[in-house]
Amino acid sequence: MQSLRVVSLLAHSQGLGMLKIYSLNTPSPQVWQPGGETISNPTWIDLINPSDAEREHAAGLLGAKLPARDETSAIELSSRFSSANSVLRLNIPLFVRTDGTKGPMTPLGFVLTPSMLASVRYAESISFNQLGAVMSGADALRSGTDVFIALMEGIVDVAADRLEDLGNKLSNLSEQVFTDSREARSMLRRALLQVGLMQRQVTQIRSAMLGVSRVIIYLCDSAPAWIDSQLHGRFRAIQGDISSLSEFQQQLNDRLQFMLDAVLGFINNDQNDIIKVLTIVSVVTVPPMILAGIWGMNFKSIPEYDWPHGYAFGLSMIVLSMLIPLIWFKSKKWL
């Protein structure tokens, strides 16, 4: 299983497609190659950025046409769900990014029959990898419907873990920002970037959960007759989990907005402090510059030139002209 995951990551990094076939009759999934044999009685066909040949082979195993990427990306509700001739088609337009948290969002499509599930995706997914690892274990899933429900539960569980992790990171960031220290002020720019990255991840999770929620709602209301009615309880449980995650997402969004406002406020205060210092310096240095300019004139009628202590008097006046504004600023508590 570990070697299969390495092959999957390598193929994805090179932009190659992959077709993995899971069956109850084999201890590990098969990575299909053109011209190769296919394991019997497949339960789950997982396509990752598939080529035309992989699509054609998977469609032959499934006995139904697979959705194109444009079809899975459609945002119209009428294009997301359809059921005909014991073939159920479900699409999630925005599911996972191609490069962790940086790439564009990619869609996810399902084609479900009474005995088999086909999934079409265009990026790696933790929930899919986790389910693939237990497909051949003691609790092996017996039908495509079982695999589909387990995938939905796994997607929600992974989303919950990611939201919890983001919440912990935000708490740590809050402790760093709201600390009266020089280090806290120096990391404000980095904190601003971290808040933006967290907001991006929360938005991604929200988009994925919205797609999953609509799939589950559709199944609760319009599931075909060949889906066991006893499974509706699991559908409702998934929907309940998604509702709880939505509340947590909203709370996390509020905290992120507060953190963003706080960081921008600290940055604004630091800029104001700099402007205040520059203003004080400019005001304090104006009087001595005026005095020095007057006594630096080359007129013969300047009386201070003939004073015995004129130089000391001039220096004293320059220093005094600087001290008076400073004392006044101090009395106003501006310093």
Feature map (PLM): residue ranges:
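Peripheral, non-transmembrane regulatory/ligand-interaction domains of membrane transport proteins
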Residues: 2-221, 225-228, 234-237, 241-244, ...
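Hydrophobic alpha-helical transmembrane segments and their immediately adjacent juxtamembrane loops
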Residues: 240-335
